[in-house]
Each structure stands twice: as structure tokens, then as C-alpha cells.
């Protein structure tokens, strides 16, 4: 039975992070920790599963900061670099296991992951620390442990992306929509 979910915002920054390289505005020049924001990602923990949504270029730093040692799945909202370029850092989560980590993404995002990281998807395990993934193309609602996941189509500029609605049975827990031009 579902008890509760703990959500940690790993990053809430823009696609280039905050502070911005070379910017001397008040926010970027600030020493306030509130103005040190990494790229968008969340960690979701329940008594059954631990998963993240998006693995941007700050993913390794986010994992070290939060002490993340285990993951049961990864969900992707879209294929922009600020959401996927930490993908290779997932190998830490399969290095000591003989299991693959499920990767959930819509077909276009999955194809771009395969194009960007062909060595991960070719099925050849080259060494012990090699990332082993189980690609799961999102085609509708799915479940991770006791969490029901509903993909939410979102317009993000000229790109179609998805957010996620997380539920437990009929109880809606929360939605996560990191990049959106408009919601309908």
C-alpha cells in the first residue's frame, strides 16, 4: 500500500544554470545559495522505489550533493541537452548490479538518446562499469512501483515535450512539468 512520496528538487535553474557564465548581474554575482541553481531535475522516493526525472549535465553533482546511491528508474521529459547530458553518469547505478536500469521516454526522445549515446544501446557490454539500460518507450500511462505515471503533453517552443502527473490510484500526488511554453 502506498504511504508517501518524498520529492527532492535536484535543480530548478534555467537551461544554462544559475549563475550564468560571464554574467555579472545581481543574481549571478550573488553569494546567496538560493542563486546557485543547477539544471532541472527531481528525485522521487517512496518505500518501494527511487527514481529521477531528467539527468542534465549537473546530474553527477546533484547525486553527490544529495547522496543518491540507488535508482530504480529514470524518466525523461524531452531530449534537450539540459535534460539528458548526464545520461552516461547513470552507469554508477548499474556498475555493481547485473540488472538494467529502466529508462522511460517518448519515442523521439529515446531515438535521440540512442543517437547521442550509441555505445550504451548497442547491446555490447564492454567492461564491468558499463551502463546497462532497459529502454521503455512511453506510449501512455505506466507504473513505477506503486506510483502511477501519466505523461502530459506540453508545448515548449517548437518542441513537444512531456511533463508527468504522479498518482496513487485515484489520488493525484503531484505533477512535474519543467519546461513549458503553455499548458492547456
Task: State the predicted function of each range.
Residues 1-176, 181-184:
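Binuclear metal-dependent hydrolase catalytic cores
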